[in-house]
Swiss-Prot record:
Major facilitator transporter involved in ferrichrome (FC) uptake. Glycans are attached at N538. The chain crosses the membrane at residues 86-106, 129-149, 152-172, 180-200, 210-230, 242-262, 297-317, 326-346, 367-387, 404-424, 432-452, 459-479, 499-519, 573-593. This is Siderochrome iron transporter 2. The gene is sit2. GO terms for biological process: iron ion transport; transmembrane transport. It is found in: Cell membrane. Belongs to the major facilitator superfamily.
Amino acid sequence: MGLFGSFGARNKATPQVPPGAVAKAPEGTPKGPETNDQPDMDSSRLSLEARNEKEIEQHPNQVTADAHLGVQKVEAAALVWSKKAVWATYAWIWVCFFLLALQSGISGNVINNAYSGFMSAPQISTANILSSIIGGVLKLPIAKILNLWGRAEGFLVFVGVYTIGLIILAACNGPDSYAAGYVLFWIGYDAIYLILDVFVADTSGLRNRAFTFAFASTPFICTAFTAPLAASSFLRMTTWRWAYGAFAIIMPVALAPLAVVFKRYQLKAEKMGLYVRQPSGRTWAQSVAHYIHEFDIIGAFLLMAAWVLLLLPFSLASNGRAEYKSAAFIAMVIIGFCLFFAFAAWEKWFARVHFINYELLKQRTVLGACVMAATLYFSFYCWDLYFYNFCTVVYNLNAAMTGYMTQIYNVGSCFWGVVFGLWVRWTKHFKHTCLFFGLPLMILGAGLMIHFRGQSDDIGYVIMCQIFIAFGGGTLVIGEQMAVMASANREGVPMMLSFIGLFSSLGGAIGYAVAAAIYTNVFPGALESRLPADLKSNATSIYMGGYTVQQTYPMGSAARDAINYAWGRSQRFGAVAATCILILGIPAIAVWKNYNVNKHQNKGVMI
């Protein structure tokens, strides 16, 4: 592979400083003894990350005067807390990641059961596409919230969104309400995960950051074994609903203390005079209007609508609600395509603040990393969307064993991420490892899955492919995050991570759509071609019923052989698409700058 009273009283938002410009403190901002120094001509030509490093060298014990409010708050906290407090905070961040990983692992195991119970198994792609697009696009406003309001405030907001999503999932009574709850749940999950990543970036030096990011993901190693067992227990002892309901109670209690820690040290810095909060001078109504423009709500809506209307029809086709030749399918795709032009026009001529920071995105390292993220997630979800069902049916596994199969990537990538993080700390570079090790392993793993994907092949070969993909993914995910963070200043880190999140989500959504289209056009035909004549009338119920219906046919029977054959054919085309798209990763990584990570990016007590 994971958020209040700011409206009336905060500094006016300072526009992000484009590369090549000189940052200036807003009028009336208290300055330290050195802030009167005027930058020389060379300073104006420094890169964004170089100017940030110079600011840290000149004012290491002061809050950055011209930074956004959220950045000032986290700098103030970092300047006053002790090393013990940092380590204790990291321990609690690890606990938060553990609970997120556990809940996510359980959800991944019970979601197929829920949709099969609704007799709507193919509709699983609808919920995934919606949540991936909406959650991905909203990452950019979330990054702005973190800079404009503060990390703790944003964290509490999205803990609330996440909890509401869990409650809806626990109480839903059909695929439509499940999809609505799943979207809210995934928005909250993605936002919390992003904010925890930003917490880690805020409290670690750049040289150690690859390791700290990887270490923060190690809970997925633990939950790889516990989540399938927990999910199996929920399904056996209660229902899948309690798999969500229990965490609707647990998660707010576990997550909220982290926000309290950051607020406590922020208030301590205020008492010490390191950070002074300036009133904005706006009324409540003016603040609402200000944030509507600052977050570019209209731009966000246009971009979400464009992607949803372009990709969702492929999911609807997979469950029979819209054929490719139908007017509804064609209209949605055309309107979605046209909305991209509407978004471009809005951004160019009407938006006061652009939804996307194009100055950052035009940097070759940032653009290359974003393309790599989209490519990686597209490739992964081309075969992963129905991988749970495939393993359950073709290899006749129970819920726990299937859960272990689907967790191989999490275990392998998180383990290898720690090794890669230590490698980056030692060598101080990451580009060539991604290009000559991580990407080839991904291509090898996806390519071998083209062959090893049916009942005639031992499951051990599938596990081997998953390990290759896991080690490649563990390298590339950390590498692309390091690439964008190394090219940014501290204030740009949330936005950079949001870019990676946005492109990952959009790539994943396209992968979901491709997987759904392959499943729709391959599985039913392959199934019907192999079913005995007396069972052909059951083809639709077998297709719609998912693995719960398909497993009722005994292994070795003609019907089960036909089902297994259909799964093998469907997975083959998904693996072909996954392998082909990874070729784009070669130029995407090649354009990265070969950054040396042995430099300062943050102020205060760090790891």
